Amino acid sequence: MQASTISPHLAELEQFNTVNVPESSANINIPSQNSHHQQQQQQQQQQQQQQQQQQQQQQQQQQLQQLQHHNHHQQTSLHPQHTHNGALGYSSLPSEGPKPSFNYDLEIFNLCKQYLNNKNHHGLALIARQKGIPPFLRFKAWPVLLKYHPFVLDPFIQPDNEVINEGNELDSSSSTSSSSSSSSYSSFSKDSGSRNSSSNGTQRLHEQASYNARSDTENRIKKDISRYVQRIFGSLSTELPSLDREILDVIENAVKKFTLKWGKIIKYDLSLLWMALNLAEWIPPLPKTPWVLVGRDQNSHPKLTHNVLDDYTHYIDNIPGLGNYLEELIYNDEHISSLAFHEVYERLVLVLLHCPEPDSRKQTSQNGSTGGKGDVASNDHHNHHNHHHYHHHHQQDQLNKTRLPVTGGTIEERVSFFIFCLRKLLPELSQYFHEEQILSKFGCLDDEWLIWWLKFCGTKAWSKFDRGRIWDFMLGWRLKNPKKNFNYYYEKLNYVNRDTLEKLGPDIFWTLNSEKTERPKMNPRNNSFRDLVHELNCNFHISRADFNQQLQSDSSKSKIVSPASDAPALTIPFSTIDPHVALIFISISLLKSKENTLVELDQHEIRQFLSRLPSKSYEYNHKQRKRLNNNGNDPSSVRSSKPSLPSEEKTLNTIIISNDAQDNKHKINFIDSIINEAGEEWRKWLWTEFVDDG
């Protein structure tokens, strides 16, 4: 589905660079067309040196401001134009404004640091999907996770129908040979002169069409960025500092690079820009700098960028040495990840837009097709073009319900599955949506929120704090390789101890055990959901008990302490269901949490609310601070103080570091609760279908 058309009358920002970026370029900063490679490197080194000097000055200002916060309440934030200095282009002082609610176990945090320092993508993926990556470490952890993500190693994106149709129309209009039979082609090839003439004409036509499409895409990207700036400041005439302009240039060119590489499969869409903008809220577009986009969650004093650490200063201050460690990661580290922003962005899009290969394409590949993933824009589009309706034949519906959780599906199939599950799990809200016609115009602008939720994984529509945690889950998604045993994965996790694994818990979407659960009598031969449950339990579970039967040598036993015979199985949680199917249940869980609010709104208000879902984890903390201010308390006096150091006999198991105010008695992790509730909704749905299918 294509996003709404951008008005061509919006003025463009003059600062944007219009130079086309070659696909082979790996530089973040956009060079001029006439520059040589050596000049590019020198310019980049000079910029990095200047940035390091400027950052040192900025750090001193931040430290001074932090000291002032302990004794004085900050009256107001500086106006955006006054927070930009000439040299650096931007000055971000940590404010005493609202902080996102965030709690994280210290033991798991230290384990995450260990995995990050060693570039252990197995361990990072485990923590990401189970507990989430600490937000201020995402700028280093996400590139590592994306580099080894299964959807990046074996990418497939559902082709856009419009791209396929345009290509077919171009081919048919340029040469009749594209639709002719093999005998016609043989007859045509006898006339070499006619063939060369037609070939040259076709090539020129393709080149002109490609140039026009590229120019149109570049103009659309610029206009969409202009709208984003207007969204932040409320005006197109805002004079942006040089740093902000440079960051936007990097984002713009990252999207250009992606469209140049993947344009034969998917056309440019507003969602592609929003993915880059949302990524830039956690990963600095400029290398060795801390500057990220603020996003929409903090708009009381509009500004475009801030320090990636600003939102979590309370947490960082509570762990000795963490501030220095993070500064080292930002300014000096080249070991963990050196991917450019556009490289991280491309990998992120491949994950968010991933779709399983159609069976027809798999069969073609098995029969000797040499087409790569970039050639998937074939005539398979007839399998997708008619899925914009909710009604399917019973056989197809059964296939979706039993296979979709494992294999995933197209966006049309996922939307249909979402509607089906919503009616099963939240019948009252589903009926209200039906009465208000909230879900009756799929594919139209009225229900655009649903596409932003399911197809684009919360891009634009969700708060950056909630979306960041959900993206952690998706980037950490990993299946167990059935050819690998427990010892292989246990070694990859650096022999993590039993207590830590228990703390990480089972997979959020763990599956019912059909053999041990009491259930009504049913015919096992006709129960397709019994087969699904059995498959999920067999394929995605690995425990220490399974491996103990395979131990043969003393050397392997020496590395793993033998458990007691009555000890519980040591389990490494692997992903159970497709991440985009898991996203469906996360979306249902989000709707459930907002049900009381939604039933009080009309059609227009519901769509507006769901298109810009507020973050409870952020607003709760904000309301808490407002209450303190109304009572006459100084917010600086309730800053989260450093926790008492543990005694020698006290373990890390009881230490939870918080980013919240010290007197906040009702600490919440809203989005973690939503994800856990999504697992409950998944099991509830699976059990219902398991029984009904009997």
From Swiss-Prot:
Its main location: cytoplasm. The keyword GTP-binding does not apply. This is Oxidant-induced cell-cycle arrest protein 5. Residues 407-685 form the Rab-GAP TBC domain. The keyword Cytoplasm applies. Keywords: Cytoplasm. It comes from Lodderomyces elongisporus (strain ATCC 11503 / CBS 2605 / JCM 1781 / NBRC 1676 / NRRL YB-4239). It comes from the Eukaryota.
